[in-house]
Amino acid sequence: MPTPSHLKNPLCFDFRAARRVPETHAWPGLDDHPVVDGGGGGGEDAVPVVDVGAGDAAARVARAAEQWGAFLLVGHGVPAALLSRVEERVARVFSLPASEKMRAVRGPGEPCGYGSPPISSFFSKLMWSEGYTFSPSSLRSELRRLWPKSGDDYLLFCDVMEEFHKEMRRLADELLRLFLRALGLTGEEVAGVEAERRIGERMTATVHLNWYPRCPEPRRALGLIAHTDSGFFTFVLQSLVPGLQLFRRGPDRWVAVPAVAGAFVVNVGDLFHILTNGRFHSVYHRAVVNRDRDRVSLGYFLGPPPDAEVAPLPEAVPAGRSPAYRAVTWPEYMAVRKKAFATGGSALKMVSTDAAAAADEHDDVAAAADVHA
């Protein structure tokens, strides 16, 4: 019997034609933990909201990063009309014929291009999604792979994404200042100025586009496996179709992030967890799919350049204590993370200097990773 095409190349799988979820895409254990609503109401599972311009923004960032590792960001000043155009262009990319998208397929070890989620290579099951990754610094050359003859789609996409990148770098710098203020480092102090300069001036950006097609059996499939982001922090722009979920303990549950028009979801990443000595913790999250509507999202990832060592800021280490984590570069940490995926361990534990001092959340969410098998 010939091998099904989606086993030879998962990108050949036709989500639109699927009437059932094949075993290649079926994940066990998706209902092991309840899902609760993270919308308003002020309950303990209401996802924190931070208004960038509010007087207590730094305090709210601190509380959210310490207790959740994520929050909804509003009042950020990125025009709503621009966000609508971004979402429209993202949807357009994934509406292209498969033969055109395959022109830009991401090869083994390549950071940019079209393909399955980058973390999919660590798992035996396939995810109900497609993605496209690019660096804003090489946007126009990268997208020529998708649109080799240029044309209106190419020009519109590049123009919109360049405008979006400019706004997001401004916002990233603003949020970095809030994070540092939340740690007690202000721009009026030498330490605060130096930290902002050292981190902000070399911070790099990567954009990942996601498409989660409607699914005939959404309780058997997963758009994106439970994971933490590896970098500093991520802005997630999601459409008004919900699907992002955050993992919380006590009791174990998934919190469904509400789809709020014009808001970004901010996720703390592992390297920021290290930079803050574990005070601001990275968050396990996943993307689920639904039966009726496609969903698109965009992740704007911030992190250090590959040659920069990331270690706990002195101001984040309690007096009389040693740093909880050793210094690592991003590539070094990704190698550790690959080993952690293979063994079911915690990458943060692997780079900790003292397991007790590290006290990271990742052991607590081990149950959330049961679907890795």
Curated annotation (Swiss-Prot):
UniProt entry keywords in alphabetical sequence: Dioxygenase, Iron, Metal-binding, Oxidoreductase
Enzyme class (EC, first level): oxidoreductase
Pfam families in UniProt: 2OG-FeII_Oxy, DIOX_N
Bound cofactor: record note: Binds 1 Fe(2+) ion per subunit.
Binding site for 2-oxoglutarate: Y212, R295, S297
InterPro entries recorded: DIOX_N, IPNS-like_FE2OG_OXY, IPNS-like_sf, Iron_ascorbate_oxido_reductase, Oxoglu/Fe-dep_dioxygenase_dom
EC number from the UniProt entry: 1.14.11.15
Induction: Induced by uniconazole. Down-regulated by gibberellin (GA3).
Highest taxon in the source lineage: Eukaryota
Record pathway: Plant hormone biosynthesis; gibberellin biosynthesis
Catalytic activity: gibberellin A20 + 2-oxoglutarate + O2 = gibberellin A1 + succinate + CO2
GO BP: gibberellin biosynthetic process; gibberellin metabolic process; response to light stimulus
Residues where Fe cation binds: H227, D229, H285
Listed GO MF terms: gibberellin 3-beta-dioxygenase activity; metal ion binding
Cofactor (UniProt): L-ascorbate; Fe(2+)
Tissue: Highly expressed in elongating leaves. Expressed in unopened flowers. Expressed at low levels in leaf blades, shoots, rachis, stems and young panicles.
Gene3D superfamilies reported for this sequence: B-lactam Antibiotic, Isopenicillin N Synthase, Chain (2.60.120.330)
Domain Fe2OG dioxygenase intervals: 203-304
Note: Plants silencing G3OX2 exhibit reduced plant height.
Task performed by this protein: Catalyzes the 3-beta-hydroxylation of the inactive gibberellin precursors, leading to the formation of bioactive gibberellins. In vitro, converts the precursors GA20, GA5, GA44 and GA9 to the corresponding 3-beta-hydroxylated active products GA1, GA3, GA38 and GA4, respectively. Involved in the production of bioactive GA for vegetative growth and development. Controls the elongation of the vegetative shoot and plant height by the regulation of active gibberellin levels.
Name of the protein in question: Gibberellin 3-beta-dioxygenase 2
Recorded name of the encoding gene: GA3OX2
